[in-house]
Amino acid sequence: MKKISVLIPCYNEAENVGPISRAVTEILEKELPQYDYELVFIDNDSTDGTRDIIRGLCADNPRIKAILNARNFGQFNSPYYGMLQITGDCVIEMVADFQDPVELIPQYVHEWEKGYKIVIGIKTSSKENRLMYWLRSCYYKTIKKLSDVEQIEHFTGS
């Protein structure tokens, strides 16, 4: 059985780790029951109780795992360390605050099963302020023109 690893880096996400855990496990169990899975939280030395909540989630569900950093390694290094620890055939990285819609997990897995090695989600619309969305679009276009490397506009980075 193929295994999906969902990696969720977090820092001070006490309000979100419980809800995102429930949402991800529900999607995986209902829509992708043919796969084994692990949900791995990598905590970046949170100070708001996030760690205790994650420990409770791990105690309740053996498929939920925790990596608890001894210090804050930053938003880029921490997910990398998480990638070194996961055991799945497919990796989906998400942020804890629902910026990445959990409803897209089945679509990502479907595209991966077609043979794609990397599947990336991009924003085509946003609930954020229109001015901020426009400014972000201008930023992406500027970076795209200045860069020698092909850029993906509105790539969330997760």
Model-derived segments and their meaning:
Residues P33-D45, I67-L68:
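Short beta-strand/loop segment that forms part of the nucleotide-sugar
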Residues E13-N16, S46, P101:
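Donor nucleotide-sugar binding loop of glycosyltransferases
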Residues D43-R51, F98-Q99:
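A conserved acidic beta->alpha catalytic loop
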Residues N69-R71, Q75-Q85, C90-E93, Q99-S158:
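Acceptor/aglycone-binding surface of glycosyltransferases and processive sugar-polymer synthases
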Residues E13-K30:
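Short, well-formed alpha-helical segments that are part of the catalytic scaffolds
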Residues K3-S5, E38:
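Cell-envelope/extracellular polymer assembly enzymes that use nucleotide-activated donors
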Residues V40, R51-Y80, L84-Q85:
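Conserved donor nucleotide-binding strand/loop of the catalytic core
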Residues L28-Q34, C58-R63:
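Short helix-capping segments at alpha-helix termini
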